[in-house]
Amino acid sequence: MIMTGFLVNLLSPVFSSLGVSQADLTSYIEKLIGYVIAILVLLVVMIVVMVVAHKAKKGFRHVIRWQAAIAFIAIVAVLVNVICYGPMYNNVSSVLNAKKVVLAQETTDQSRATIQKVAEEGMVLLKNDGILPLSSDTKKLNVFGWDSTNPLFGGTGSGSSDSSTAIGILQSLKDAGYETNESLTKMYTDYRADRPTIAMAQQDWTLPEPTKEYYTDSLMDEAKEYSDTAVVVIGRSGGEGADLPTDMKSVIDGSYAKKAEEVSVSPDNYGYVKGSYTNNGDYDDFDEGESYLELSNTEEDMLDTVCSQFDNVIVVVNANNAMELDWVDKYEQIGAVIFAPGAGATGFEALGEIINGSVNPSGKTVDTFVKDLTETPYYNNMGLNAYTNVEDLKEQIAANDPAYEGSMGFVNYAEGIYVGYKFYETAAEEGLIKYEDMVQYPFGYGLSYTTFDKQIENFKDNGDTVTFDVTVENTGSVAGKDVVEIYYTAPYTNGGIEKAAANLIAFEKTDSIEPGESQTKSFTINKEDMASYDSEGIKISGGGYILEAGEYTISLRSDSHTVLSEEKFTVDEDIDYSKDGRSSDKTVATNQFEDYARGDFEQLSREDGFANYDKACGVPEEDAYVMSDETRAAVEENVFGIYDGTKYNNDSDEMPAMGADNGLQLADLTGKDYDDADWDKLLDQLSFEDMATLINVGGWQTAEIKSVGKIATSDCDGPAGLNNFITKAYGTAYPSEVLMAQTWNKELANEIGVSMGQEYVDADNYGWYGPAMNIHRTAFAGRNFEYYSEDSLLSGYMAANEMNGAATKGVYPYMKHFALNDQETNRCSFLLTFASEQTIREGYLKAFELATKGFEGKAMAVMSSFNWIGTVPSCANNELLNNVLRGEWGFVGMVETDYDGSYGYMITDHCIRNGNDLMLGFNSAESNKLTDESATAVLAMRQACKNILYTVANSGYYADGNPASGMTNMTKLFVMIDVILAVVLIVVDTIVIVRWRKKKKQAVNE
């Protein structure tokens, strides 16, 4: 419609600045266009009446005009009420009914204390030549690096937080008793005050750093006189929707940004490559082929300058991604390196404490630091891979959905199960690599100011389990904590089921152990947890878990590479779990994804010492970019405008009751079993419109449904703490999940959940969009700050404990992003993610599996992901959301999409028919419309509503029975405005009429 287009073009600049997409704006206008036209018609009528009234007598003329104006205002007020309590109710009420959030001081204090504890146990000492802790004689420090004045406290997007009250690096050093060189600090703050923004729509990858000319002789002479010790801070981070560039030269020269036009038919919607960079000098900061995770030329110049003037140099790497750090060994003056990811509100206090020795570092790496990222097995199979032969399909989708990003991407998980340390340990054992040439710092690595001796004791094979103890003795001179890391090695047959040479199976963090003292940790390992998944049918037709016969090794290691103690046991014959399942399974695990997710790429295999490494991990061949007819046909079935939900309909399904008057309220179901008969009675009370609203209005909320007494509730981000941009409720800035994971402390993860959960309670917000537990498949993933580790077991246990902590407060966590959402590029552009089922289950579902099976709360939720698993969207994947999540793992609760931007494939009908219950949007897209009123479709809606209602009913919202009802803030506001407006209009109308009558009477008397 011409009017709709005009209004969209007129209002887009204003609403886009508020974060409202053009697609959403278009949808809102389409909903309201009838009302807008009515108001315009009324305006025209009013104007006509006023013009015609000119012919009336002078006094009566004014009465007519005033009456017309008053009538117009009154009718518009009625229409505004109808709009706000009709089509826009959930959008308006979510804002107006939001409560003013004031966190209790006790809550904030607890959060800040917990965050500092996380950093004290999570910062990793990567190198120490004896320089740390600093001598008590050192009172002053020269702090170099622009990042020292603008450190990274967390991430962006859903992983962002309010860092306005956060303690920075310089303040932490001062709090630790050091003075810092203010001349250096002033030079950096004068150079640039603000950090460049890395956002979803546009990224500024600039690394501000003064060129070497700024380090004048007088400045450096002053610095040397000030102190003989230098601290250098280097920072890096990505962002939501923004993977880190692998070729910074292309960002600098602009060719990177031009890729949007090459791969997208809607380049304005395609933001992944809209990056820019401003050089610090009259030269390029990066040379051709250098990545964002390498030092810039200006940073190298700064390090050259510092190391030429100081013999005592401490480097602080303030990064959320594992950088290339081989340059550390090129400077003999660098005596210590501390890895300090985004530290949240108070985490940097730990930095000063580690430097002065009041805290003994005990953090361990959660990723493998490699010397050359271009030599990693994933390097050629990530990022901007787009199909080249589907232009017609892309044009068709763009015509149907204005939110479509215009591209179709793919990613092959060609490295298979060999992610991170699992590749390097196995490749070293097979002789493919020389370990020391490739790995700078292993997974699970971290130094301490003391030394520990530990070994496996009392090892016993109990049949289904093995049990043992590990005694950790502090053999050094200061108290400290240590991490006990347990790995297993399974027997591998050449050409058989893929197996890594080292696999983390258990871990524990000790208490602080005094010198000469010890602590014992006891372990029970289930043998079934060492089973491999046979997706290729090597031993199990149809796929399944199998514990193969042979010798197994349980090893105690100080990191993934260094074995301290080991024990062995033997499995006499293969144990096939594809028939009866593992003890933790609700149903047997068999192949679910292999038919459509495996793809036809060469997968890395350990066979013959990784003989196919070059082919599997090389640049994809040209035909990989050509979508096959079979793949296209499968994709088209899931495309908005082509998708036909009636294919799911079953004529034998019976239409359930709707709109019944059973007298139940949602509060009556709190605490009742999921299968309780009263649930059907409650669901019978829902109308078709109730169900459509409850399903579609899930944007940072769940909708009010009066027919069952369900209140409107708030959900919000995120992994870094309370961050509700709708209600303006912001909590304490929690650190990145990388720093949390580096503690290797499950009890502390639980404490994080408890303290963060209390902030949600204070905000009356019990839905938490977190934690996130995707895998650090690559170092370049823009959202690694939001995920724990490259290892699925570490991720799963940390997540489970954090979730359980939050659940004690009545918070229902949305573990996300389910699943294989391991890169940002093309995430909403039909990102077809191909992997073997073994890879999917062992590498990428396992964290979610452990968190689900280990959850101890009453209410839990899941957020599905943007990407596709093979040719099926994750948000509408029956095998993922029903067969695996609910069937195998026993999950009970609701599943919500990631942000429902439509994107050409997020279709409500498709989602609810395949296990996704709630749309994270505002019922604003054409793809949200639920029009199929068949029994099958209504049953799917009913099931989705049950999952939503069950989750909310068992959360903190309903912990004390029926939540307080009565008049909402929105209703109070509207009643007040309506009453005031009515009184004003009546008074004005009365005055007009009285004055007219008075003048008329005077005229008669005259």
Label every PLM stretch briefly:
Residues T562-S584:
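Short beta-strand elements
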Residues M1-G537, S541, Y545-S555, D559-S560, ...:
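Glycoside hydrolase catalytic-domain context in secreted enzymes
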